[in-house]
Amino acid sequence: MNIGKFKVDVLDTGVFTLDGGSMFGVVPKALWAKAYHPGDELNRIPLSARPLLVRWDDKKILIDTGNGDKFSDKLANIYSIDKTKSSLEVALKQFDLKPEDIDAVILTHLHFDHVGGATKKIGDKIIPTLPNAKFYVQKDHLNWAKNPTEKDRASFFKDDFMSLLADGLLETIDGEGEIFQGISVIPVNGHTKSMQTVKITDGGTTLY
């Protein structure tokens, strides 16, 4: 997809599963099972982790990073993740890009399926997957992710983002703001507190 000077592509960083009832809420299983997926023996449904790659001029940025591959064997089994396929690096290769080519990442929020690919584990160390990238997240959301409620604690893995903060790579935004000319963020409350929606516009066509 092209929006003025911006070229927007979808990255495929793998599939994972979550409980179908949690995903569809008050919608009866009889309806979502027929329309989407019947669920496996544990009532889990497949979901895709698909960040966006945005390119213009000499800039290359991502919106979210997918799951990553830091999962323990136990968590990989719970979420049905094939760690050999859940890779941001492999997804970037499809566009002839390397991790060091990425200039910035706008994080809609810090749930593991959106920020997990931002870091990787080498031995006992957590290091950035994208060594030259600056990361952007809402200030209120970062505070929430550091001290989540019992309800959504399981969706935040601090190895995904705390090392970015410690290394000075994670920049917080307080409310609406333009990150690059034509690319801005708008805070929203969705399935977690203080997420941000990304707006890409050339002055005529707009993508949210």
Task: Give residue ranges: language-model regions.
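A short secondary-structure junction signal
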Residues: D73-K74, G117-T119, K146-E150, T197-V198
